[in-house]
Amino acid sequence: MDKKTLEKYSSAFTLSDMEIFIFPDLLYALVLANIMSPEIWKWREDPWFTGIGKMGPLKKIHRVKQYVMEHYNFNLDLETWGLTDKQTEINRFNDFVDMEMLSRSNALFGYEGDKYYFDMDIRRHFGLDKFDSDIIPYWKTETVEAMNAFRYKPNHQAGAGECVSLACLYAAALFIVAEVPLEKIFLMGTPLHSQNFIMVDEGVLTNNRRIVTKSMWYNGTELSALARRALEHEQVTYIAHSSGWIHSMYPEATIDTVEYQLFREKLTKYLQTTIDFEIFMNFLRDYSRHQKFFQLCFQCQGANRFIQLEKAFGYEHGSKNRLGDKTGRKLYCEMDEEDLYLQPIDHRYRIYHEDELFELKPYQAFIDSLKNSFPGLVQHAEFFADLKKFVHTVPHLPSTKKEFTVARPIKISPGQSREEIITYLSSIRHSSFVIRHSESTSLIADLAFYAGRYMDSCDWKPFFKAAFERNPVSVEHFRDTDLQAVHAQLQSWPNESIYDGNRLALPDEVVNYLRGDGIEKAITLVNVAKARHLEVSLEQHNNMITVRHGKLKFDFTTVKKSSYIWNNLPIL
């Protein structure tokens, strides 16, 4: 296995943001690993999803969203997966990655973010300013098992994960529970965020735990503004799909060209809208600095009333009614008489719902009508620039000028069982631990078994490389503890793995979630010892794993029943 292949396959276990950025095959591999996991299939038995089969596609997606909202939190801290440094990671990748291009595209290697995205520097935003500038976080993308296991961490009552974890969770859940075909799901990554675009109805965007329909994209709320900012201000670095991937940094791409073109068309349509009174009011809700130009006019008891627009919007706070939509008239009734004028307010443009200006129009037709109605607005160029940005986002997608190569697409359907899917994915992997691929096999399918920790059928060398090189949290946790005390503390934790069968957790998962099978605890102890440059060995006798260091002997009991595990322990 050459250096690049070994790094790629070991990265399938740790799945840090930088590893997924450099090896785009890994993103969809995690989606498939989550689909193969029994965890999301259990959701189908939850009473919340009773009758979901009779629901329409969009309602199914909303149902999944509510489940995700109730069972998972967003988590992006520095403590869970620990820190590394730029030079260590550069040494891993510099033989096969253009580091200058990487620094322009990846937040951890120098990307500064769009000026509109943060009003402070990125390192301060993420809490890295207290460390040397060379220090960067691992930010590992969690499997569904690792996400679920957050509930075992102190001060966590639910599952959790960062944005890429949530995107991969959503993709798998929409396939398994909402029965959305994989062909309709596109995963998108920017230097600072990860979202999915689902080609259902007019389009649905996932954003961390939430979803954003087209109408929500234009509702002008704070939540929609948060969902919009990545696509408004950042380059979409890579896109992953069941047919393959495309990446702005690489000249080659494997995504199906027809599927990619369809995605571009659907996303572009999602990101532009015609304008009526509701859309215009939503724009002014989002870009509140322009409210000062307008007054709202409406009829009350047979006479016109006028109110400064910013005061009118103030009444939305604490009310379920909103200006611009069908509940707007109810909001008028909630306004205090002392804020209402009987005569038009000087120097403000009058807007009212019934004005033919607000009959549904394409953007340019609306702008022409607006300038005709309010000539004085023409001098405020920033107003028109913001309006255009609000109603028409131009996504910065990877160029189609790539060397497209044919990759075997993943052909599974929501009607298949978990067992059928695992059998199919197994059939299109390589047939031995020698990692070779042809047009009849799928690299992504193969990597999915590594991401899912199916150690019965994976080469252990990448696993041990990941376990002993990129699990700093377990090392730090036991920093001031001698090996006997490390063993005692590991033994005090529940002897249960977060992964079923013979799948294995990494040392930092054991320490984060305070539990593990005996072999996982043994590997954690070895990781701590190796970090101290101590010589250790592993032995197995039936269900007993023994770690030896000099005259010291540490026993662990395992219920993992794979003979292949024992055959590979000597690789240490």
Q: Model regions: which residues?
A:
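A structural boundary/capping signal
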Residues: 1-433, 437-572
